[in-house]
Amino acid sequence: MSNAINQNGTGLEQQVAGLDLNGGSADYSGPITSKTSTNSVTGGVYVPPHLRGGGGNNNAADAESQGQGQGQGQGFDSRSGNPRQETRDPQQSRGGGGEYRRGGGGGGRGFNRQSGDYGYGSGGGGRRGGGGRFEDNYNGGEFDSRRGGDWNRSGGGGGGGRGFGRGPSYRGGGGGSGSNLNEQTAEDGQAQQQQQPRNDRWQEPERPAGFDGSEGGQSAGGNRSYNNRGERGGGGYNSRWKEGGGSNVDYTKLGARDERLEVELFGVGNTGINFDKYEDIPVEATGQNVPPNITSFDDVQLTEIIRNNVALARYDKPTPVQKHAIPIIINGRDLMACAQTGSGKTAAFLVPILNQMYELGHVPPPQSTRQYSRRKQYPLGLVLAPTRELATQIFEEAKKFAYRSRMRPAVLYGGNNTSEQMRELDRGCHLIVATPGRLEDMITRGKVGLENIRFLVLDEADRMLDMGFEPQIRRIVEQLNMPPTGQRQTLMFSATFPKQIQELASDFLSNYIFLAVGRVGSTSENITQTILWVYEPDKRSYLLDLLSSIRDGPEYTKDSLTLIFVETKKGADSLEEFLYQCNHPVTSIHGDRTQKEREEALRCFRSGDCPILVATAVAARGLDIPHVKHVINFDLPSDVEEYVHRIGRTGRMGNLGVATSFFNEKNRNICSDLLELLIETKQEIPSFMEDMSSDRGHGGAKRAGRGGGGRYGGGFGSRDYRQSSGGGGGGRSGPPPRSGGSGSGGGGGSYRSNGNSYGGNSGGGGYYGGGAGGGSYGGSYGGGSASHSSNAPDWWAQ
């Protein structure tokens, strides 16, 4: 039955309008008719339950002088104010409305009876809150504020909005009344906010200030602080910014605990059964005033947040790269770190960087002529990675060390929904992990500014240059308003650092420390490497036999994962289909897969649902997948550095692993380098490799892409080239020659860039640096007397 007014009777709203539901007396006690209900009954207008709450005023006369309040959005389409009054004078009151289960509206455009002046309304409550002036679209809510009047004269701030953090969602409270053209109107707005509703049966119990934004106060709208969602109002329940985000806030303070998130981040720990073997790995740090290394995390001053998260991550003691890198970074020095894969490089730079960011706290946006937009983020830290998978992995680690803090990490990579990543940026970020292409795109869109960068990390730097990212990296570092070298702290991490990379680093690093952990460019002795001669047509049969032996082996468990590498995308799809037809639980990953498919494949592989993963090189670099017991090189790569990274997926963090490679005539180009690697890691040497290497040596073939003096003598980044001694008979000035086959001799030269001098290696005949001199590893494999280019003890060649 309709409640509308009709000629023969009264509607339900009219019948209840004169009732005093609060125990008082109605303003009008006579019979309620259609003639008296709208004009005569001024004090008892019935407010339906879904319209009761924060902003609506039950007294129409008061609302006329004070303006409509802040609609609080209690789960319905709430529009404050009386619609009949609004039609009488559309200029008189504009109460903000809220959408279903979203934030309430802003304070209305009020009319003052005494002065006859109209006040300007506040910003409407946007999605999950909002309010205030246009740029303050985060105050009390998430985003998307609607502008209401001149921001200098804005009315009440937006409603508190629902909290967007984890945990239950609660209705937000009303914002403050703000300022108006007339002081009396502002005072009326404050009185209105404090006024109790006439009908309190729907009133909710009080909550503490800051719990859900209900105590936003007068200054909830109009907050202009950078990244400050809730410094003086607003902020949703369980929001990291609910206690404020301004310069007066202690960012080192440990936040509230979230047990569900804690299990999600730290639920699985794997320290490795052979971790103590790392204690004997030699470490070399070169540079000026190198800080002393630490032996435990207690030896360095860390914030309470970092200590708590390190304990949750089950990091009982630092790895060798962490022992040296953490004190170097905390002391503000630039660093080039070269460590074997799986040695904890990610935590080595995340722990000290986030620790310094917590101590640094709030950094205001840069001063510029243009008006600052809250939609543009100015992070303090930037981590560049070559692949989407590595960027995602670093981001997951960053979330661990940012747990219970006010700092928010974000990840940017190509192949995913751009708008989704932009929404994540709009929520705020202090540390960005990104691939170079997508970061440049976001900078072009005006979503990210680099003016506040204090910490820059290039992870897997050699891989990024191999993939052709050097122009983009140079634009990001040198041309897009990033603070110059010396004003920011720059770190480069990778498992390999050829000399060309070290020379490039001189443009990005200032007075850096070179850190070499373990045999540079080598692989772990925890990995048992087996090389099998397999003709190309027989590879699939050998693979089936190998997988069957793994599955039937005594050490096989359901958590034992097998990673198979192939060279081409087509080969990955073909091999996956073949193994699937042979009833093996298998999935695959390569560059033509969508990001969603790649993430799903990695999830199935990590969980053990598909314990066999066929992959191209896209998954070879940096991915930390626990429990990979066996790596199979179905197709060997063309260079030994790629081989090192592939087999580095197993034997991580001290665990034992197995790597099996299929070798045939097609892999002759990698034979000599691979033989060196096997000798170095004390592996069994197949006779066919010795014969093939011997044939190549006597043939005088030129080694492509390598300097004279052999793999470890000239071009692999085994030493800090700033300490190499220049000179030598017949040497030339400029970059060292890249040729140098069997029997080639002659001294190195010198290279100088930006004040950093790199002396070339003296001598260096033959493949292994034999003869007179021969570079860093000269004499290790070649005959004759070798003189090393450094005066320090050369434990690399021992």
Curated annotation (Swiss-Prot):
GO terms for molecular function: ATP binding; ATP hydrolysis activity; mRNA binding; RNA helicase activity. It is found in: Cytoplasm. The keyword RNA-binding applies. It holds the Pfam family Helicase_C. Residues 31-42 have a biased composition (Polar residues). The gene is bel. It comes from Drosophila melanogaster (Fruit fly). A motif (Q motif) lies at residues 295-323. Vas and bel colocalize in nuage (perinuclear, electron-dense granules in germline cells) and at the oocyte posterior during oogenesis. Residues 542-693 form the Helicase C-terminal domain. This is ATP-dependent RNA helicase bel. Disruption phenotype: Flies are recessive lethal with a larval growth defect phenotype. Hypomorphic bel mutants are male-sterile due to defects in spermatogenesis and female sterile as oogenesis usually arrests around stages 8-9 and egg chambers completely degenerate. The lineage of its organism: Eukaryota, Metazoa, Ecdysozoa, Arthropoda, Hexapoda. Belongs to the DEAD box helicase family. DDX3/DED1 subfamily. ATP binds at residues 315-322, 339-346. Keywords: ATP-binding, Cytoplasm, Developmental protein, Differentiation, Helicase, Hydrolase, Nucleotide-binding, Oogenesis, Phosphoprotein, RNA-binding, RNA-mediated gene silencing, Spermatogenesis. Residues 16-248, 689-765, 778-798 are annotated as: Disordered.
